[in-house]
Amino acid sequence: MKASLLNKLDVLSDRFEELTALLGDAEVISDQTRFRAYSREYAEVEPVVALYKQLARVQGDLEGAQALLKDSDPDMREMAVEEVRETKQQLVELEAQLQRMLLPKDPNDGRNVFLEIRAGTGGDEAAIFSGDLFRMYSRYAERRGWRVEILSENEGEHGGYKEVIARVEGDSVYGKLKFESGAHRVQRVPKTESQGRIHTSACTVAVLPEPDEQQAIEINPADLRVDTYRSSGAGGQHVNKTDSAIRITHLPSGIVVECQEERSQHKNRARAMSWLSAKLNDQQTSAAASAIASERKLLVGSGDRSERIRTYNFPQGRVTDHRVNLTLYSLDEVLAGGVDAVIEPLLAEYQADQLAALGE
């Protein structure tokens, strides 16, 4: 293992000892804020340090076995050869585990998200496909026990959506969906196509982590134009009698967000402000992410909205993710919510990128 990684592990071991002492300190115990913060850090550091101690024990076993290779007894030497082989294999596995545990964690992985799906080229067929994508993510959310809440929708004339915005709430939503941002292309024969010709349409997907209070960008109220209007969304007759829907324009950036699904104007405004904050955060971080991706030539993770990331080919029942050259002939299962079949290889590729960077 590289000296730089061993140094990191030594620092973590020292920190673990500090945390153990701090969590037993009466002054810390009486301060619940500090106690919770130290407890969270302890929970993160403890498994890494435990594995590092195991690595040290196995390293000691290897040195002992190597010493026995010089024993005058041939039986002992034969046993030592086998033990050296086994302990070396153990060391390789433990080092790989430790490297994965040392990978930098994305602080947004545990967050809820704003999911934006927009029809692109292809007219009505693109809008219908937007509906298919939204249904796919909704079913995936059901499988994972997440909650999906539509904030804004603009339905297509023949079904689907010209645009649909939703908030997805649950455990590690961003960590799972963060590589879904980009252009999704569909190839199929539209129902209105009498000649049976395959048409190509596209939709764009954006996945934005919902910021917490510490992350939220401070927005000057003078930079906002707030419009109210009558909602055309869900909620029955009541919503059409009051101007409960909210549209907020951030004048410096030109970003517009709107929320129309709640009956309460106050709730719609709160959701819209949270979404605006997420979009402003995304604007800041996207440029940095693109620069890093370009510099390191990452296959996954640039998050460029215009990048074609996936093709759904209906005649062949095929899904292809172009970033990792993944092709699956299980289109129906993926669209039914089995998105993990695509997401897991992407996450594995991203982890491989990180491991390569860790070793640089």
Curated annotation (Swiss-Prot):
Compartmental location: Cytoplasm
Top-rank taxon: Bacteria
Gene3D superfamilies linked: 3.30.160.20, 3.30.70.1660, 6.10.140.1950
Any single Gene Ontology cellular-component annotation: cytoplasm
Family: Belongs to the prokaryotic/mitochondrial release factor family.
Entry keyword set: Cytoplasm, Methylation, Protein biosynthesis
InterPro entries, A to Z: PCRF (IPR005139), Pep_chain_release_fac_I (IPR000352), Pep_chain_release_fac_I_sf (IPR045853), Prokaryotic/Mito_RF (IPR050057), RF-1 (IPR004373)
GO molecular function: translation release factor activity, codon specific
Record PTM text: Methylated by PrmC. Methylation increases the termination efficiency of RF1.
Protein name as annotated: Peptide chain release factor 1
N5-methylglutamine, modified sites: 237
SUPFAM superfamilies attached to this UniProt entry: Release factor (SSF75620)
Keyword check for Protein biosynthesis: yes
Primary site of residence: cytoplasm
Coiled coil: none
Function, as annotated: Peptide chain release factor 1 directs the termination of translation in response to the peptide chain termination codons UAG and UAA.
Origin species: Pseudomonas syringae pv. tomato (strain ATCC BAA-871 / DC3000)
